[in-house]
């Protein structure tokens, strides 16, 4: 008997959805940063074992939108809860249910498939706090399973996979067994660069950073030559991203190159520039160019 199913992971921004996905896959697949809302596109990640296949939809955190990009991210997360076989609602024990959590719960009550409550970061919180959070959420709605985990340390991740297998239906293998992600290489490369920029810039530059890959060519020796722009919204942000004597941009390129080489399994040369595009997050045509779906 072979089983297959689509699983979506939902939760507030920065709750650890991408970290959980990486722990399940044991590979770095989704942009992870300490900054909220760093996952912007629904990334379908495929886990294939001998007797099952799980297709994960890693979504942006649900939050109140402040611009067109925010509207896209919220719609993207909401749409992902439709037409799936299982929903994982990820929370942190050290945070009481806020407006964002209550908003998600109201949506989950309308879902016709099993919903798991997954408590992340249990290694960072005392058992009493975890138990208190469990009780609070259990009173808000009924969950098919409640699983405490540590996505970062991998604790109880195998148990979570076993429970997911239990709930998904019998079905075909939708993707080839060697396929682990359904996004193209350019998208992944852009996300890796953006992650490094977010990490290195910390709070120096607001969240309005995007990356566009201008060129990505592979020569006869198998080496990739990549060129791209880091987009920011204000002229004042440009020198911050570049850094003194180009030091910050050089570090972004260096750290990104290491991860891109691991992803592509090839040597990589990468050149990055910084370009100002004011209010790009409200520019519908530019959002489309960067791979974000058109809002209806």
Swiss-Prot record:
Main location: cytoplasm
Residues reported in the UniProt entry to bind GTP: 11-18, 58-62, 120-123
Keywords: Cell membrane, Cytoplasm, GTP-binding, Membrane, Nucleotide-binding, Ribosome biogenesis, RNA-binding, rRNA-binding
Residues covered by the Era-type G domain: 3-170
Gene3D superfamilies (UniProt xref): 3.30.300.20, P-loop containing nucleotide triphosphate hydrolases
Assembly description: Monomer.
Function noted in UniProt: An essential GTPase that binds both GDP and GTP, with rapid nucleotide exchange. Plays a role in 16S rRNA processing and 30S ribosomal subunit biogenesis and possibly also in cell cycle regulation and energy metabolism.
Name this polypeptide is given: GTPase Era
Native source species: Clostridium botulinum (strain Kyoto / Type A2)
Gene: era
């Amino acid at each position: 008997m072979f089983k297959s199913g689509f699983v979506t992971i939902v939760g507030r921004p920065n709750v650890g959805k991408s970290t959980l996905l990486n722990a399940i896959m044991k590979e770095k697949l989704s942009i992870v940063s300490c900054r909220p809302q760093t996952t912007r596109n629904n990334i379908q990640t495929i886990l294939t074992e001998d007797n099952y296949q799980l297709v994960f939809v890693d979504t942006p955190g649900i939050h109140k939108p402040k611009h067109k990009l925010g509207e896209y991210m919220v719609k993207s997360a909401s749409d992902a809860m439709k037409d799936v076989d299982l929903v994982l609602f990820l929370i942190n024990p050290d945070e009481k249910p806020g407006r964002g959590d209550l908003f998600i719960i109201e949506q989950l009550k309308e879902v016709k498939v099993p919903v798991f409550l997954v408590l992340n970061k249990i290694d960072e919180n005392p058992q009493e706090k975890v138990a208190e959070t469990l009780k609070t959420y259990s009173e808000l709605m009924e969950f098919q399973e409640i699983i405490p985990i540590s996505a970062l340390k991998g604790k109880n991740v195998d148990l979570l996979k076993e429970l997911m297998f239990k709930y998904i239906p019998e079905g075909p293998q939708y993707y080839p067994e060697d396929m682990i992600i359904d996004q193209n290489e350019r998208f992944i490369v852009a996300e890796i660069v953006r992650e490094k920029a977010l990490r290195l810039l910390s709070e120096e530059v607001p969240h309005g950073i995007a990356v566009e890959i201008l060129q990505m060519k592979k020569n006869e020796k198998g080496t990739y030559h990549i060129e791209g722009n880091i987009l920011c919204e204000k002229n004042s942000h440009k020198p911050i991203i570049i850094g003194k004597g180009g030091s910050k941009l050089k570090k972004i390129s260096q750290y990104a190159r290491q991860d891109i080489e691991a992803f592509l399994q090839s040597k990589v040369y990468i050149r990055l520039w910084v370009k100002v595009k004011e209010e790009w997050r409200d520019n519908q045509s530019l959002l489309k160019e960067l791979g974000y779906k058109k809002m209806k």
